[in-house]
Amino acid sequence: RMPCCGFLFAEKRRPNHIIREMVDFYQVPVYELNRIKNGADYVTPEGKTVSNNLLTRPSAPSRSYAYCSDTIYLPSIVEQIKGVDLLFHEATFANEDAPRAKETFHTTAAQAAEIARRAEVKKLLIGHFSARYEDENVLLQEASAIFPDTQLAKETLCVSV
């Protein structure tokens, strides 16, 4: 067997957005703006502290995506993918074929859903289905019973994160 790896893509945190009217009101010098965007309060020349939340509004939250395929059921990945916005996880077999999944180093739809549930991901996308299933909805039903926000990965599917 060859070791496989997954991928975790996570955006860097973006700086807060300056509220121009408030920066103008407090006459904040331009050289202070980067510090303020990164969370610092502003201290006026008179010594008054102006809270950062008066000068900025939060940026959109960072997004994250994890991809795990061609892998046996591996609960230890939970900590690495904790809280991702979207998880693609293989769901090669149905529960009734769990012994075959273990033998071939793959996972079942229920195992993929359990990983998603334990990792508290926002959305699960399952794929890499065995050709033995004419109707992949059986895999979707098994996964959805454990992790309701599950979707089948189909060719040309586009998912917003």
Q: Language-model segments: what does each one mean?
A:
Residues 73-161:
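Binuclear metal-ion centers of metallo-dependent hydrolases, dominated by the metallo-beta-lactamase
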Residues 1-67, 71-79, 86:
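Active-site-proximal loop/helix segment associated with metal-binding centers of metalloenzymes
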